[in-house]
Curated annotation (Swiss-Prot):
Belongs to the urease beta subunit family. It catalyses: urea + 2 H2O + H(+) = hydrogencarbonate + 2 NH4(+). Its main location: cytoplasm. Gene3D superfamilies: Urease, beta subunit. It comes from Klebsiella pneumoniae (strain 342). It is found in: Cytoplasm. One of its GO terms (molecular function) is urease activity. Pathway: Nitrogen metabolism; urea degradation; CO(2) and NH(3) from urea (urease route): step 1/1. Coiled coil: none annotated. This is Urease subunit beta. One of its GO terms (cellular component) is urease complex.
C-alpha cells in the first residue's frame, strides 16, 4: 500500500439515495464566471445568479463532494439540487440563514 492510496470496490457508488431533490434553471446575469461548490447553500450563491431562491432554501448541488459547477456570463442551465441532511442548520456562507433551516421557513 502506498501512503494516501485508496482501495475502492469496483462498480458504481450511489450518492444521496432517498434524499429530496429538485431541479432549477439558473442564469448568470453577471459579467464574470461564477463557480459554486458542492456543499454551498444554493439559496445564498452570488446574487448575479438568477433563479427562485425561496424554492431552493435548504438545498445544495447534487454533485460529488469537492467538485463545483461553473456558470459563464449569460449562461443558462438546469441543475439538480439535493436537500441538506443531518441537523439541517446552515451557518456562514452569506449569513442569510445562520441557524436551523426550518426556523427560516416562515
Amino acid at each position: 500500500m502506498i501512503p494516501g492510496e485508496y482501495h475502492v470496490k469496483p462498480g458504481q457508488i450511489a450518492l444521496n439515495t432517498g434524499r429530496a431533490t429538485c431541479r432549477v434553471v439558473v442564469e448568470n446575469h453577471g459579467d464574470r464566471p461564477i463557480q459554486v461548490g458542492s456543499h454551498y447553500h444554493f439559496a445564498e450563491v452570488n446574487p448575479a445568479l438568477k433563479f427562485d431562491r425561496q424554492q431552493v432554501t435548504g438545498y445544495r448541488l447534487n454533485i460529488p463532494a469537492g467538485t463545483a459547477v461553473r456558470f459563464e456570463p449569460g449562461q443558462k442551465r438546469e441543475v439538480e439540487l439535493v436537500a441538506f441532511a443531518g441537523h439541517r442548520a446552515v451557518f456562514g456562507f452569506r449569513g442569510e440563514v445562520m441557524g436551523p433551516l426550518e426556523a427560516n421557513d416562515e
